[in-house]
Amino acid sequence: MRTIAFCILSASLLIASVAHGATLQVSSNLQAAIDAASPGDTLLVAMGVYDKITIQKSLNLVGNGAVIRAGNRDACVNIDADNVRISGFLVRDGFYGIKLNYVSGCIVANNTVIHCAQPGIALLFSDGNTITGNNASFNGIVGEGWYGIYLSNCNDNNITNNVAFGNGAYGINLFPSCSNNTIRGNVLQGNMYGLYMFTDCTKNLIEKNDMSRNTNSGLDLRINCTENLIINNTMENNVVAGLTLMEESGENTISGNVIRSNGRYGLQIQSRSDGNTIIHNNISDSQTGIFLESSNNKIYGNRIADNVIQADDRGINRWNAQYPKGGNLWSDYHGQDEMQGPGQEAPGKDGFGDEPYLISKTVKDQYPILGGQVKQIVILTKEMTPSEARVGDAVAIKAKLQSRHNLLQVSARAYQDGLEAQGYCRLVLSGDLYQGAFSTALLEPGRYDIVLSAKDARGYELQETLGEVKVTSRRGFASS
């Protein structure tokens, strides 16, 4: 029996209007129920395991945990009609999970799609759809699709608040020719790439996604992916890079992102990917913060901090805006601010260093922003006794160090008048102190600075004077 009713869906499904039609209870043969339903009907599907389905009319399917499974050469859910809504299903083990073909106005919400050979959720030649709140994980691991969520030749879709974890290659993949899509608020972790855009993907909004802990890059754009807006995303702890632009992927805007603790590069831009604007990002704690083999990129207003190599520019790029907008904040810039003006020639402070920050011999940031100095290795406490020793005596050294990365080597050496003297002492961690005994046996009488050297696993180094030791002659010997 069919009961005419209003079906009000929750706001989490992003359905703005009330659906008019019949509400049907389904407990067996879901495909038969779909075939018998009329456009606009709502199907409430009971718990259970159902075979693959094809939807060719405007329907609203509500799963409440029902399972849809298919063989590994079939799609679990084929959507071939506009304005279909499907929510609350566990979809698994198909060739595709949920596949949208040449449709618009569809909403796919709050489903879990796992263990499919091809994409978990796929949109093919489909515009104006919403994919929200889904978990598309562990797809394409042994198959040939590799994707959590896949868009091909798709425009004006909203892909929001989904999780794509542990897929064969891509959390979300756009290929080819996908434009004006919104990719917002997704968690794309544990894949090879978090978000991968390939071939003529333009004018997309990439916003507030977490693209971290992937085995290659968090976000990767290749082959003429241009005019995209990449804002307020997090790209941390990816093995290769936080963000990569390659093969003529230019004219993109990259703003307000946290790009931190990535293995090789925070941001790499290569192979004629020209004319990008990189502003107001936090690019830190990577082997190389920014790597450029392209030109005409504008880089300013960024915090570039604590990278082993802050920037490597092999093109012709601009590292500051015109005065008074300025350049970037560099954690290893130690200049002063006593002058102001475009040429930094007028007395007065303006927040910019008076001398440029040198990226290389030929590349500079003309207006480095002050306030970014951060030490990766810090001496918290130090003790050196005695302060006066005879030749041959040992000087006991204790130091407590703080490091953001594992310390590989800590040692002490003697310097006199700025020149290294003979003698070396390795400091070994005991409890929370690095300790060692520096022998003065090879030193001539005189005054020496004892300098601590430390190096961590990321290649950061520290050299800091612990104090001065006066070395005197041994008893019975006079200094020459």
Segments from the language model and where they lie:
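Extracellular acidic, Ser/Thr/Pro-rich low-complexity tracts
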Residues: 400-405, 416, 456
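Acidic Gly/Asp/Thr-rich repetitive segments characteristic of extracellular carbohydrate-active
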Residues: 22-51
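Surface-exposed, short loops/turns at beta-strand junctions within beta-sandwich domains
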Residues: 441-446
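Aromatic sugar-binding surface patches on proteins
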Residues: 430-437
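Acidic, glycine- and Ser/Thr-rich low-complexity intrinsically disordered tracts
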Residues: 22, 41-44, 274-280, 295-376, ...
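Extracellular beta-strand/beta-solenoid scaffold signature
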Residues: 70-78, 93-100, 115-124, 139-152, ...
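Extracellular beta-strand-rich solenoid/capping regions of secreted or surface-exposed proteins
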Residues: 31, 35, 50-60, 68-106, ...
